[in-house]
Amino acid sequence: MDTLLLLKAAIMGVVEGLTEFLPISSTGHLILAGSLLGFDDAKAKVFDIAIQTGAIFAVILVYWQRIRATLVALPTERQARRFALNVLIGFLPAVLLGLLLGKAIKAHLFTPVVVASTFILGGFVILWAERRQQAAVRIHAVDDMTPLDALKVGLVQCLAMVPGTSRSGATIIGGMLLGLSRKAATDYSFFLAIPTLIGAGVYSLYKERALLSAADIPLFAVGLVFSFISAWLCVRWLLRYISLHSFVPFAWYRIAFGLVVLATAWSGLVTWAE
């Protein structure tokens, strides 16, 4: 396989790994990177599933101790069952809304103006959330969440169906606005990412199954590995970062990137369509 193509796959994997779990929208960055690299044909949809799988493996590895402990304790411990139930409750709204409105959203909302607007608006929402964070915290750990808290965050996660919103951004900032601490909101966002991304990946793989080819396995493998490594490093870094810092820098980054979306679309440099 062409070495240049494998290099592009590695770059796309790194972009996915670095942006999937930060509140900055991986989709917007993948479209921009794919367009600039010429890595945006029909098979790119299947490739996106591969690199997203690498990111999922990374967050599972980071939280493996907690995941394993929960699975082992499910038959005997009420807290483990409550935690698993909260993840399930948070996951379901996105499933239902995705099945009902997914096609319509992709058909009508994937435009430069929408993507840029959600990037910029999301930046200002982060700034607002951080301003009220200290006074609003009532939940300091994921284990303190109620099923109603989980449902509310799950409903907020549905906003991520709008291009440019960011799934992690919606759940983390939404959680903070609902009273979760920065750490609790981030942890729950990552736990919620596991079933959400797996479900989305399986559904997308089924839809795009006609594009699968054994010849593309090396390409997908490179993307998956680089996505896994970069996502693992990114998640571990973010968990350390939020113990000392706020999400304000990500807010300004989103606002700037939204302007980049508009500039690249108006110049014709990037085609902002899925």
UniProtKB/Swiss-Prot annotation:
Record membrane topology: Multi-pass membrane protein
Catalysis performed (reactions): di-trans,octa-cis-undecaprenyl diphosphate + H2O = di-trans,octa-cis-undecaprenyl phosphate + phosphate + H(+)
This protein's UniProt keywords: Antibiotic resistance, Cell inner membrane, Cell membrane, Cell shape, Cell wall biogenesis/degradation, Hydrolase, Membrane, Peptidoglycan synthesis, Transmembrane, Transmembrane helix
TM spans (from-to): 44-64, 85-105, 109-129, 185-205, 215-235, 250-270
Annotated GO MF terms: undecaprenyl-diphosphatase activity
Pfam families hit by this protein: BacA (PF02673)
A GO term from the CC aspect: plasma membrane
Disulfide bridges in this chain: none
GO BP terms, alphabetized: cell wall organization; peptidoglycan biosynthetic process; regulation of cell shape; response to antibiotic
Localization terms from the record: Cell inner membrane
Coiled coil recorded as keyword: no
InterPro entries attached to this UniProt entry: UppP
Highest taxon of source: Bacteria
Entry keyword annotation includes Membrane: yes
EC number(s) per entry: 3.6.1.27
Described function: Catalyzes the dephosphorylation of undecaprenyl diphosphate (UPP). Confers resistance to bacitracin.
Family: Belongs to the UppP family.
NCBIfam families xref list: PRK00281.1-2 (NF001389), PRK00281.1-4 (NF001390), undec_PP_bacA (TIGR00753)
Miscellaneous note of the record: Bacitracin is thought to be involved in the inhibition of peptidoglycan synthesis by sequestering undecaprenyl diphosphate, thereby reducing the pool of lipid carrier available.
Protein's recorded name: Undecaprenyl-diphosphatase
Gene name of the record: uppP
